[in-house]
Amino acid sequence: MRLSSTTFVVLAAVLLASGTAVSKADETGVTNVNAVHSPNVLAGVDKRFLRSHHTEDGKAKLSNYDNEERNGLFAAGTLSDMANDMIFRFKMFTKWKANGHLPKAIKKDIPRSLYKAYKIHHRMN
């Protein structure tokens, strides 16, 4: 046998032997990773209460500010659209009244012109 053929056979045998050893090392590492658990998951503390407040009775309640923000009733874009579009303004005034917003309560949240218009709308309807 030639020297190059012998070298090739030896290198192939070494490569196969080292490949098997590496793959067994990977298998043992994977089983150890699965054994580690977070203490929060085991204790049942994995719930997150985003934008809400957890109360003693177990129900999450949003504050009035969060409810308004979610509905978009007093968002800057909404107020801008109301100033430019009378039909949209009337629809929003109807929603405000349906949600129980009194003119005096929202006076600081809206522009003066919308406050005056809402005050009239609230009295008429």
Curated annotation (Swiss-Prot):
It comes from the Eukaryota. It is found in: Secreted; Host cell. A motif (RxLR-dEER) lies at residues 48-70. Disruption phenotype: Leads to the gain of virulence via impairing effector-triggered immunity (ETI) allowed by host resistance (R) protein Rps1d. Residues 1-25 form the signal peptide. Induction: Expression is strongly up-regulated during the early stages of infection. GO terms for cellular component: extracellular region; host cell. Keywords: Secreted, Signal, Virulence. Pfam families: RXLR (PF16810). InterPro entries: RXLR (IPR031825). The RxLR-dEER motif acts to carry the protein into the host cell cytoplasm through binding to cell surface phosphatidylinositol-3-phosphate. Belongs to the RxLR effector family. Effector that suppresses plant defense responses during the early stages of pathogen infection. Suppresses cell death induced by effectors and PAMPs in plant hosts. Triggers a hypersensitive response (HR) in the presence of Rps1d. Suppresses BAX-induced cell death and enhanced P.capsici infection in Nicotiana benthamiana. Also suppresses effector-triggered immunity induction by associating with Avr1b and Rps1b, suggesting a role in suppressing plant immunity. Avh6 is present in P.sojae strains that are avirulent on Rps1d hosts, whereas the gene is deleted from the genome of virulent strains. This is RxLR effector protein Avh6. The gene is Avh6.
